[in-house]
């Protein structure tokens, strides 16, 4: 029974260890920061359009 508890503890420790990406990066890989930047740019653009629609007549792209 003692061996089982040691095995479970070792299993939990190895499961929580940081994993290493064994595959080399290719040129198709896009860093996550790029997606984050795209999201921020999209939100900023939508907010700019919203403020433009509220402040100026004829500025809103959808009428």
UniProtKB/Swiss-Prot annotation:
Superkingdom of this protein's organism: Eukaryota
GO CC term (a single one): extracellular region
Gene Ontology MF terms in the entry: toxin activity
Propeptide: 23-50
Cellular localisation: Secreted
Keywords assigned: Amidation, Disulfide bond, Neurotoxin, Secreted, Signal, Toxin
Main subcellular localisation: secreted
Protein name: Conotoxin PnMRCL-0111
Domain comment (free text): The cysteine framework is V (CC-CC).
Span of the signal peptide: 1-22
PTM description: Contains 2 disulfide bonds that can be either 'C1-C3, C2-C4' or 'C1-C4, C2-C3', since these disulfide connectivities have been observed for conotoxins with cysteine framework V (for examples, see AC P0DQQ7 and AC P81755).
Tissue specificity statement from the Swiss-Prot or TrEMBL entry: Expressed by the venom duct.
InterPro entries: T-conotoxin
UniProt similarity note: Belongs to the conotoxin T superfamily.
Keyword Transmembrane helix: no
In-chain residues carrying the UniProt-annotated modification Tryptophan amide: 62
């Amino acid at each position: 029974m003692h061996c089982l508890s040691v095995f479970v503890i070792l299993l939990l420790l190895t499961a929580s260890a940081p994993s290493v990406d064994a595959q080399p990066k290719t040129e198709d890989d896009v860093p996550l920061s790029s997606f984050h930047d795209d999201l921020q740019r999209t939100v900023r653009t939508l907010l700019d359009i919203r403020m433009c629609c509220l402040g100026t007549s004829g500025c809103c792209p959808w009428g």
